[in-house]
């Protein structure tokens, strides 16, 4: 976390992946996440992966449209007060 980004992965001083975490998959949360990911990626000169972290699965047509903008979903659930992420290793 750098004050703006929820979470990011860097290598040799360059941000490689940006994660935007949401506690809901509501329309408002999606608007917010898309805007944040796109705006935060603007000053990054290298290719950066954009990951939207959500608790509920999106409809496939929404996933497809997000992919057109380079945004990939990552889903999670809570088990015994711990987050469990589905497919995280495929995104790293």
Please place each PLM-identified region on the residue numbering.
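A short acidic/basic microdomain associated with nuclease active sites
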Residues: 1-2
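Nucleic-acid nuclease catalytic cores
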Residues: 43-71
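A glycine-rich helix N-cap at a beta->alpha junction
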Residues: 70-89
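Conserved beta-strand segments of the P-loop GTPase G domain that flank and frequently precede/overlap
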Residues: 20-22, 52-54, 76
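Residue-level detector of flexible, active-site-proximal loop/helix-junction positions
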Residues: 25, 57, 80
